[in-house]
Amino acid sequence: MKRFILIFVGLLCFTLLSALPAYSDSLLQKAKSGDAEAQYYIGRAYYDGNGVKKDYNQAFQWFKSAAEKGITEAQYWMGNCYYEGKGTKQDYNEAFSWYKPAAEQGLPEAQYSLGNCYYEGRGTKQDYIEAFRWFKAAAEQGLPVAQYLVGNCYYEGIGTKQDYNEAFRWFKAAAEQGDAKAQNNLGDCYYYGEGVNEDDNEAFKWYKAAAEQGDAKAQYNLGDCYYYGEGVNEDDNEAFRWYKAAAEQGLADAQNRLGNCYYIGKGVKQDYNEAFRWYKAAAEQGDAGLQYCLGWLYYIGEGIKQDYNEAFRWFKAAAEQGLPVAQYRLGDCYYYGKGVRQDYNEAFRWYKAAAEQGDAYAQYCLGFCYANGAGVKQDYNEAFRWFKAAAEQGDVDAQCRLGDCYYYGKGVRQDYNEAFRWFKAAAEQGDAYAQYSIGFCYANGEGVRKDDNEAFRWYKAAAEQGYAGAQYNLGVCYSKGKGVRQDYNEAFRWFKAAAEQGIAEAQYNLGFYYYYGKGVKQDYNEAFRWFKAAAEQGIADAQYALGLFYDYGNGVYQDFKEAYYWYLISYRNGYTDAEQDVKRIEDILTYQQKQEVQERVNEWFKTHPKE
């Protein structure tokens, strides 16, 4: 296992955007009147695009006004502007001159940045001792990246005497705050017994924490742990997985290890490079099957760097010899514009060539073209015909689409029984959409006798595969006790899963559960967050709920204008119970306030048209 020490340099933007006031006319007036704090906030608003269009030039000018009045944070941001050349010409000397006063006033971000200037010799003479001093000042205030750098300085003896015990202490402080590089180096300390007793289990734990955050060196080290069985049971598959993750980030040692895995067949099938070499030799002699294989290797980047242009070239060579699988892959290239300019007409032509030879996937694709009018005039009858041909060969996607055709009466007379039959065929092959559809049929008695227990079973199968609609419906089953014993905890769990995938109804239900503490500890802040997500997607009940939040100050500051805004949107969206609240709030607001809100509401409906 190899040691990796890296000094991280660059601009850090630590202040959370949510903690700062957004741009507003009142804030701007304060700033123009000379209020230094307001000037800084206006600068940040322009810098971050918080309530106003990003404008680094404006940000720089407002930071300058505030910085010259002694606002520490503004001095730090002046340093950032000069360091990055944002809003002004890049000038490390000026960056250094602004970081310094902010650092001397105790701002940890500025202390880190000043240390970085000394470390890199930017804007000042390179001085590792000063760099260490300022990194340490920031680290002692809890800044994770500074703690990591102090650990590195102690480890390497940069700017201070080498001290593995201190290195360990600072790596641990940063690692416990989630810094991935520190977690990796802490793993190294445990692995090599530097500054702490050697402990492979602890080394594995910290490598894994960093690897799961995407740190390439930790992924490589974790691969070694699995490969050699250090701190964990030996597992070639896991070793391969982590080497691959690191290799795909460009880490040379991991790429070498990954090559070894392919070469000797550890954790992966043996010999992709050799396979590629022989495919190429045969393909160049005109064998259609091997031309296709070579094209596929280029297409998926297996054993060779991914190259859609080369994939297209080899698919075309094989397709022109009449190979169906190459013809439909060539169709894919044209359809998605991979290796060639997107061309639905050509995609349709090649799908048709393969479909007429009986290739099931091509038949499905041809049906898809007819259904969507891609490369051919839309024709549901033809779509149905080709979906059926593919479905009868067992193509799961075609079975799903054939089920849809029967369910909605597209290209064929509506027939819930047939829809159910084809959904079931696909569901039994494990397709999540089909499992969801089967559940829906059982829940509504469409094509089959209504059966809540079966509906629940199929929703669960689809939900466990991550299908969002099924996760929502499963939540409903648990919430209402349909097909399963009522269980608010499980209902909450599945609503949350669906909500996080963007299902508006699930977001509303999740907000409801947080609001009333059903299946989860009551939390108005979380309730507000999820109601807002649902409201933005047009759920009128959620819009009304937001109005209540702002009206009564639950989980958010009381704000009658915002309450009026959401009440009015919900009312115009069909939530008639909001009418009395709209009228009540109108009596509270001024004429100008009402006009402002009504204009905002009109804008909302322009960007959120009713379906």
Give a label for each model feature.
Residues Y41-D48, W77-E84, N116-E120, L149-E156, ...:
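Hydrophobic face of amphipathic alpha-helices that form TPR/SEL1-like repeat modules
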Residues M1-F4:
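Positively charged n-region of N-terminal signal peptides that target proteins for export
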Residues D577-E611:
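Terminal, low-structured helical/coil segments at or just beyond the last alpha-helical repeat
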Residues K32-D35, Y46-N50, D55, F63, ...:
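Short helix-capping/linker turns of helical repeat alpha-solenoids
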Residues I7-S18:
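Bacterial N-terminal signal peptides
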Residues A45, A66, C81, A102, ...:
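TPR/TPR-like alpha-solenoid repeats
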